[in-house]
Amino acid sequence: MQERADSRTLEMIKQLLSKARINTKRWAEELGTVLIVADQKSIETANGQFALCMAINMLSRLHPVLTHIGVSIPDPAVFSVNVPLFTGNKILDAILDFINKLKLDCKVERVDLIHRGWDAVLSIGPSNLAIENTISIASDGWIAYVAADGLATVFTKNTNPIGAYAAACIGGMEVFKKVFLKKSNLLLPEKTPFDIRWRLKFIKGRLSFSAFDYRVNGSPANNPSLPLTINGRDLTIAGVGAGGGATAYSLASLHDLEGRMTLIDPDEVKPSNMNRYVYALQRDSVSNRPKVEAVKELLSDFKKLDVQACQNSYQELTASREIGNIDVLISTVDTKETRRNMQWDMPRVILDAAVVLTDFYVRRVDIGKSPCLICTHSPKEVERPLEEILSEVTGLSASEIAKLRSTNACLVQEHINRMTKSSEKYGFTLPSVGERFSDWLMMHCGELVLSATQERFPLPFATVLPGILIAGEVIKERCFPKDVLQNYYSYDMINLPANGMTEMKPVSDCIFCSSLATKERFAKKYG
């Protein structure tokens, strides 16, 4: 089966509705419409420009839930900041150019005459539209504002892409939920017990969320301004998919960034990545461009930032050279094993993020102060190895599968020949020659009918927002070290934002962080 830009969105719909199959043609044919509007004052601020572009970037990728997006903004509006991928001086022209380069199935067009027929409206700044399902957003520095009944604030000149992007994600998620609910009720009115519609909650009234201290409706006092130049010093991002890519995109939106950044990811951009990779355009997926190269280009305007792009898995990279001191490591990788390997390499700080369907977390690891990645991702001895289960179904040996997964290798004709008989027996789609085993498994785990794989197709907003928050943690680590995450935050995005962070303690019997030898080695390494 050919991979499409909406492949993962369709799989996500199945999981949200707890359905083995959906009528993909009907989902594409049934309209799902969103109007994005902005007033003159909001669009003149840098924060308003950040929020508008992130909203366009995210929502236009969500076909077939969204089929049409209208954009109504003042025509003379011009950029006062650099927003990655949105090039040119005039904002409307830059948006239309971005959509042309994205080339996805959701139709995005300028709207001059506003009618009441939209399923939902996202207003960048205050709105006086009398249209049902209108969500308004604004930001002030680190603080995002989202309202269902009219904003009590506006975009301020306290420029900060983190707060603006958080507002766009939370507000964008609200309009997405409204359109998703409308279409799913129309196309699949009967709900299973595990249908996500039982748990959907919408913002009522007004809500603020601080990307600085993770408070909901808290005091706006804790909201420091960003310096013009931020020294990232030595930063490593392992995994530049949706989360790590959103971190890099957010950092690329700063006024100036200097230091050294290492990007690690073995994969190329694929069509199915397009629903959640905010840095990717069609040219990247068509050319199978390495993810690290696409992300590196985002950061090319920073003259004092040295970016190293490593198209390797973390295991391959660390096996090929000695790992010295890693100052700050951002972990947005897919497997527990890789996270444990990262922890054994003993970075000074790890910023870890992950998502399961609609629920994400961000975590900071400080040895001796918080749970380490071995505490939180310890292997369960009772679990049957996934490779054994896959071997029984695919016809490949467990050792072959382990190697294919660990090296991110491509399948050859000989693999496919041996999988053919199993495909006929179990009814799964055979991979293509040259396709990565991990990519094929991700796309067809449902056909394998393996409850043990528990593969999930996450909600795009739930992959991007943690990446934005991790970028905020990088900024705080360098500029506001007394205010870093202590040490865990989670948010289920089909619900309302959770209020505040949770401080967790290390596991008392952890073989790594509770070891005196580990603490002595860490102290010797970092003084």
Tell me what each language-model feature is.
Residues 1-51, 56-62, 88-234:
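Glycine/serine-rich phosphate-binding loop and adjoining beta1-alpha1 elements at the start
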Residues 1-44, 64, 184-247, 254, ...:
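Phosphate-binding loop/pocket of nucleotide- and phosphate-handling active sites
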Residues 52, 244-248, 270:
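N-terminal Rossmann-fold NAD(P) dinucleotide-binding loop
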Residues 63-105, 260-304:
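Glycine-rich phosphate-binding loop and adjoining beta1-alpha1-beta2 segment
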Residues 110-112, 310-319:
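Conserved SAM/SAH-binding loop
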Residues 115, 322-324:
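A short, aliphatic-rich alpha-helical micro-motif
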Residues 119-146, 328-372:
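ADP-ribose/adenylate-binding Rossmann-like module
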Residues 149-193, 197-199, 358, 368-489:
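Adenosine-phosphate binding glycine-rich loop
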